[in-house]
Amino acid sequence: MEIIEQIEEWRKRYSNWQTQHRSASELDKSYPFVENTRSPFTPLRRSLSMLNLALISSAGAYIDGTESFDTDAPGGDLTFREIPTGIDPSDLLFAARGYDPAFVNEDANVQLPLARLLEFESNRVIGQLNSAFWSLCGFIPDAASLVELTVPKLVERLKHYEVQAALLVPASRLCHQTLALAARGIEQAGIPTMMLAVEREAIDLAHPPRAGFYRGQFGSVVGRPNWPEHQRRILDEALRWIESASQPGNNKLAVELESQVEAARGER
């Protein structure tokens, strides 16, 4: 199964869009989002409490003092960073494009939930969080180059670490497409994935193998800043669906009503 169905047709649409939007720093309604009709699927063959889980974020995290992502690249920056999960969040910076970094600068867990996932490891919700996570700047309009150049290298690194499942967290609308395509490539390589989502249309078009959707905000996809319980609930429900899913699809996370009640009570 192709990561981008009818990729040559998509290239033509993208080339036409590029010709008309050479200086565009953001997307408009004419951008040719990838339209897939089917999804690859790899079932999880072990329980959450026994697996090595990888985190993939498209919020543009990089280590302070190292090279940033190129947020001016017309087709997007096709590189990724491999970062130790034990890093102090204060040592990270975010090259934000396509989303407001205010929330992630307030609480990195809203896009990079290392603290929450390490809690899950301690509580044996997951076997372990992989010792490295992967960071992209997910504003990548050139989807064809992404799947041909970036995704194979990312899959190679996941296999090197013997990752058994991957959680993908987008930051912007275009990030939803970027990580949906990455998830398709990872799943084709035999590694189950789960993608969080707050933009329904993007995942309906790109067809990631599994997506947990709720009506959240770009730049705060794992939950509201400084509200650990909200973040835990979103992650817990999404991850447990990896275990139970028997076919590809999108699942609406039942986190909104409970969160509204908690907020009204001041339980944050």
Where are these regions (language model features)?
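Metallocofactor- and cofactor-centric catalytic cores in central/energy metabolism, strongly enriched
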Residues: 1-268
